[in-house]
């Protein structure tokens, strides 16, 4: 029997299975962290538990620091109640290597965790106290791209945000309101310095975060519900910094294969759960071995020595180039392409799709031929080496059972950056967008996906997306030949990042989409454009 509890980490089962357990004093770490916190993190999901918390765990093991991390969760408090608290804040890390080995490690760097929403005022009040502490250096976030939104797709402020504008700082179900409110506490405590670091896959994430926070603060000052000077405090980088970052580590849902392996080793209580918010989570986190975190070195109150754990610190311009390299060329567009076609062709894993020669040709065409030529070399990471690793090592990893269905989530929010940026670069550099054949196939493929049918005409379940309700009726009318509906979707800059018709790509995308509507049309399109398989 095994228990994820720091008091039982000397049990024989951990040694027998070569689990790397912490050697530092966990109780001491927790005590001093809660007394004088230096690092708070919001967003208690899997990439934090394994990667980001793992970085601090490395520093603790090397005796570079004696502090841990305090965690907050606004979106899904079941994660805190049913995973963090039940497992004594510990995570069993499982790295799924290509060679089939699965090294195990206990990550123990989380000192405590709290829900922080309108139903969890006690947790919020804990953070009020923590934010008023002088030695707090950084607050990091992994709340997904949606977490930074304070407006809906029509540009209107969300109801909970409008409510906060009138009521002023306080606990909310919107994470941006909560962070703004807690920063106001820090301002009132003496304009104490702090860095607020987005670690989400979101281009210019520091800018996106700042704009949401500043907008809330501006409306508070305008409405007279905060003391004058709060906005000025946020805009002073010597007081509050919003460093940009690029993060990359594939961290899929808990794998049944891993659960079975752990149970055979004698570990109990490893069953994954699905919360009411549709979060898939378990006492363990499985992930690939590759990982990258590049951060703008702007921390007005100091920072952890995360470079000793492999983090790259650099300037903002370099972070931006690395992010663009990954998000618009070397990984994310390839992921989205595989996700869209994987859903329609019946695949259950990305690795399985990498055995499809036509899909591999498609992502190579998008990456090497179409996107890389307009990506700036960031120097600190080589783009060709990076994409080589993605295509040859990372995506084919059969142990990473990442699903097309998971990656297809929120695709409408991803397309403008993952594909729209490349189209914009072609236009600004005077290049012929007619050469963007691979990207056209993916955009048409996504429109075809929204019809909710696979290549055999059978119904498929579409992954969650905030624009589904709005787009599906338009796509269906377009599929039935309604010209105005087709034109309206092709001109959606908010969806594609550009007006596809004005960009010279509308006709090609429409043509490919219409071909894909036919029975087995998707396979036929792939054969036509990517060649027959051997």
Language-model regions: role of each:
Residues 1-534:
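Substrate/ligand-engaging "lid" and interaction regions
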């Amino acid at each position: 029997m095994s228990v994820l509890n720091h008091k039982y980490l000397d049990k024989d089962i951990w040694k027998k299975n070569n689990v790397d357990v912490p050697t530092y004093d966990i109780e001491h770490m927790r005590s001093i962290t809660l007394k004088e916190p230096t690092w708070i993190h919001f967003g208690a999901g899997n990439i934090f538990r394994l990667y980001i918390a793992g970085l601090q765990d490395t520093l603790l093991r090397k005796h570079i620091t004696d502090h841990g991390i305090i965690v907050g969760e606004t979106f899904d408090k079941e994660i805190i109640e049913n995973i963090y608290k039940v497992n004594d804040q510990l995570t069993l890390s499982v790295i799924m290597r290509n060679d089939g080995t699965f090294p195990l490690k206990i990550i123990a760097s989380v000192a405590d965790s709290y829900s922080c929403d309108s139903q969890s005022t006690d947790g919020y009040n804990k953070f009020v106290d923590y934010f008023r502490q002088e030695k707090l250096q950084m607050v990091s976030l992994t709340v997904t791209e949606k977490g930074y939104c304070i407006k809906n797709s029509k540009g209107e402020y969300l109801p909970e945000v409008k409510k906060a504008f009138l009521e002023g700082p306080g606990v909310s179900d919107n994470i941006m309101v909560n962070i703004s409110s807690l920063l106001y506490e820090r301002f009132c405590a003496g304009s104490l310095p702090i860095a607020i670091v987005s670690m989400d896959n979101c281009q210019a994430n520091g800018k996106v975060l700042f704009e949401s926070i500043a907008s809330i603060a501006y409306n508070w000052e305008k409405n007279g519900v905060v003391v004058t000077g709060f906005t000025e405090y946020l805009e002073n980088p010597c007081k509050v910094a919003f460093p940009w970052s690029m993060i990359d580590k594939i961290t899929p849902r808990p794998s049944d294969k891993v659960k079975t392996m752990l149970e055979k080793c004698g570990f109990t209580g490893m069953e994954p759960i699905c919360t009411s918010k549709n979060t898939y989570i378990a006492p363990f986190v499985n992930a690939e071995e590759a990982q990258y975190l590049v951060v703008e070195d702007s921390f007005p109150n100091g920072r952890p020595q995360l470079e000793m754990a492999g983090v790259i610190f650099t300037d903002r311009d370099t972070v931006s180039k690395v992010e663009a390299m990954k998000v618009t060329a070397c990984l994310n567009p390839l992921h989205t392409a595989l996700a869209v076609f994987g859903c329609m062709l019946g695949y259950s894993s990305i690795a399985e799709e990498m055995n499809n020669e036509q899909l591999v040709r498609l992502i190579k065409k998008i990456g090497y031929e179409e996107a890389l030529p307009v990506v700036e070399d960031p120097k600190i990471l080589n783009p060709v080496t990076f994409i080589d690793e993605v295509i040859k090592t990372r995506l084919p990893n059969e142990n990473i059972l990442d699903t097309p269905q998971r990656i297809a989530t929120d695709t409408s929010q991803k397309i403008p950056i993952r594909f729209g940026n490349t189209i914009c670069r072609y236009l600004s550099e005077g290049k012929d967008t007619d050469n963007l054949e691979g990207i056209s196939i993916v955009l048409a493929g996504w429109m075809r996906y929204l019809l909710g049918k696979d290549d055999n005409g059978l119904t498929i379940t579409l992954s969650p997306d905030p624009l589904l309700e709005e787009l599906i009726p338009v796509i269906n009318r377009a599929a039935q030949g309604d010209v105005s509906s087709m034109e309206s979707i092709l001109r959606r800059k908010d969806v594609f990042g550009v007006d596809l018709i004005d960009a010279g790509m509308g006709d090609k995308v429409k043509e490919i989409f219409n071909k894909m509507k036919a029975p087995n049309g998707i396979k036929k399109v792939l054969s036509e454009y990517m060649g027959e398989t051997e």
